[in-house]
Amino acid sequence: MLTRLSNIADQINGPMIFITATSLVMLIGITAAMVYFTFRYHRRRNPHPEDIHGHRVLEIVWTVVPTILAFGFFWYGWQGYRYIKSPPPDALQIDVTGRMWSWNHTYANGVESPELYIPVNQAVKLNLHSQDVIHSYYIPAFKVKQDAVPNVPGLFLWFEAYQTGIYQVFCAEYCGMSHSAMWSKVHVVTADEFNTWLETEGAKVAQMKKAAESGDDGGNLHILGEALSKSKGCTACHSTDGSKLIGPSYKGIYGKTETVVTAGQERQVTVDDAYIKHSMLKPTDDIVKGYQPLMPSQEGLVSEAEIKALTAYIKSLQ
């Protein structure tokens, strides 16, 4: 509970220990006084108790002392709050987007990942966004948590991890049917390992864009699409093995005739490139029968190159 895996942990542990210790001392003192007074002023010892109409010193003491303690709690917490809300200007900036029901991490060079990769002993600032409802980005090991609210800019959290390893990320705000499955991981690695990972993933992004724009994918565009489906959180709702999740499975869907509900009317459509693209950009227009219209629009969130890569991946799952 008091592990020191990040700089923010110090700002949380200190006030918690102070408040807990103070409360414990007060609990013991008040309980001891109650027990003492119970015996000391028992009816058998004081058959005719004296009425006390006021005691100015006592009233001042039990007003002033708790007030000082309350201000002490506030001051201690305020110092930590100021620190938590003051990231260093050279912190590594990463955009984090929450959506039902996955996280996406976007780096400055365009790399996207469903899991967070950061270097050890370096300040990291996570700029939080939400595509749909309120989510909350929570890393228990580092004692950091911040809500991501739709259409509210400027939300962030920052920290500096002190130890390499893999840590859990959770959504700490109930966000619907698969809220409990909205978790991810933080990979804390050395600076060299982080730079290598970022360069490698950046090369994949450049390759995907080039292949999609030229139309010559060398047979590898579906591989890039597979990685993209994970980073975009597609696989949180669409399985690749035929099993039913929140949305239709990708397996065997390309070229299939599906029954969809359009403006309240059922009709037949063939799943092709145009249908897949339209379903990404305007997912509530044609709802596959038997499913709910839960998918948010990806318009402005996926590029033409990414749509082509995702389509190639879906095609490959026959």
Predicted regions and their residues:
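Hydrophobic alpha-helical segments
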Residues: 1-25
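Beta-strand cores of secreted/periplasmic/IMS beta-sandwich domains, seen most often
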Residues: 17-40, 54-137, 154-170
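Membrane interface segments of multi-pass transport proteins and intramembrane proteases
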Residues: 47-52
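Extracellular/periplasmic metallocenter environments
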Residues: 90, 148-214, 235
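Electrostatic cytochrome c docking/interface patches
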Residues: 110-112, 195-230, 269-270
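Residue-level "contact hotspot" at macromolecular interaction interfaces
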Residues: 117, 148, 160-161, 221, ...
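Gly/Gly-Pro-rich "capping" loops immediately C-terminal to redox-active cysteine motifs
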Residues: 160, 183-191, 226, 236-282, ...
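C-terminal capping alpha-helices of c-type cytochrome domains
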Residues: 195-201, 206, 293-318
